[in-house]
Regions:
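Phosphate/NTP-binding elements of NTP-utilizing enzymes
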Residues: 1-117
């Protein structure tokens, strides 16, 4: 989060897990605690599965994506990302991961993979 908020402004990032429910359960609580401790402000729009984060005069959007099956790549198609986190990537279809990687076309974008379990 610090990397995204200090290197980019007005960009879009992806936070991905097998399901959006698992993302909200496993990733977002710790991330919110970290953001609060760092002085970041987050406004979540749960109905549209994203949050806008502000820090030091910068603002970026973080979309939530679930990669549970072969239909999931269509959910992330078409968006231009400056970075993406794939939680439990080993549980996601390869086609979803490939689409997420392909979406990271902003100069300097990065990928993070967690292969647990």
């Amino acid at each position: 989060m610090t990397w995204a908020m200090t290197n980019f402004d007005e960009c879009i990032f992806g936070l991905c897990s097998k399901t959006i429910v698992s993302l909200k359960r496993n990733i977002l609580p710790a991330l919110r605690g970290y953001m609060k401790a760092m002085g970041m402000t987050a406004v979540e729009v749960a109905s549209k599965n994203y949050m806008d984060v502000s820090f030091c005069g910068r603002k970026n959007r973080f979309y939530y994506f679930g990669g549970r099956d072969e239909g999931s790549p269509s959910l992330i198609q078409g968006v231009t990302l400056a970075g993406v986190l794939l939680d439990e990537a080993a549980l996601m279809p390869r086609s979803f991961i490939e689409q997420a990687v392909a979406r990271c076309s902003v100069a300097g974008s990065k990928l993070w993979f967690n292969c647990n379990p």
